[in-house]
């Protein structure tokens, strides 16, 4: 039995719909397992710009800091594309990462058997793919000091890529700890043949590796992104800096066959962590009850496990959605194109509340 306070930041586009679905399933988990979840809502992204004049209001930061975890929908949309840089929705996401010290982003990449046919790659390449990308979130070029100047009539722009040793050390150590519970292999991705920051990254990775003699470390240049397509099953845990991780994780997300199935977690060293689906705001289908809620629901499942330590609840729920969304042929917008967001959520809620269904599902998927 537990009481947990969750800050919900729907954001833009389909963010409201998918977070609403995740909240409904969390309520079902609370009923089924005897937990109490309190949900409080805040603004971020374009919605915050429209209502509060800033992509991240102070009220939202305060709400998040006072909560046990944060559930985010999505930010962005063409409506704000012409805004000045400080009034872009994405600035809200960068700011909340910094404010909460969300230093590590975990993106599981799994291709389930039922989704193999949806992948753009050949089945023999993606069947059995199961790795995690660990991306550093609070350092690097996204948080450097950019500047734009005009000298002698010529426009110039500068972005600074800066990493401290301790920033690298803590993210690499997390990757090794994660790998120790998996297949015991870490692939560190850098650009050490060109960048000084990457040479430091590689040196620190070697130092941390000495603490984990049971885990294998390999280095790859970021040029290795072709390996994600050529031989994705070789990877277990990939760890990399902010910008490289941004690019690699988006590319890797397509291996699964559906962007709408992938969750992510952004972990804090000392405060609440944030959970969000990998997909974007999809403004073209916003409000149409067509959005796939599974990535948001799985993100909430990661919250149960990583922030609250509710392993049984998270694991059981993951099996519920797998059985419904994959095994029974209920994949939203794929096998049953007329299955709405709300219908998918209701199916998963019903299975969570039905003890018999959970027992059967866990037997099949254990």
Curated annotation (Swiss-Prot):
It is found in: Cytoplasm. GO terms for cellular component: cytosol. It is an enzyme of class 1 (oxidoreductase). It catalyses: (2R,3S)-3-isopropylmalate + NAD(+) = 4-methyl-2-oxopentanoate + CO2 + NADH. Its main location: cytoplasm. Substrate binds at residues 97, 107, 135, 223. Coiled coil: none annotated. Pathway: Amino-acid biosynthesis; L-leucine biosynthesis; L-leucine from 3-methyl-2-oxobutanoate: step 3/4. NAD(+) binds at residues 77-90, 280-292. InterPro entries: IsoCit/isopropylmalate_DH_CS, IsoPropMal-DH-like_dom, Isopropylmalate_DH. Mg(2+) binds at residues 223, 246, 250. Its cofactor is Mg(2+); Mn(2+). Gene3D superfamilies: Isopropylmalate Dehydrogenase. Belongs to the isocitrate and isopropylmalate dehydrogenases family. LeuB type 1 subfamily. Catalyzes the oxidation of 3-carboxy-2-hydroxy-4-methylpentanoate (3-isopropylmalate) to 3-carboxy-4-methyl-2-oxopentanoate. The product decarboxylates to 4-methyl-2 oxopentanoate. This is 3-isopropylmalate dehydrogenase. It comes from Bacillus caldotenax. The lineage of its organism: Bacteria, Bacillati, Bacillota, Bacilli, Bacillales. The gene is leuB.
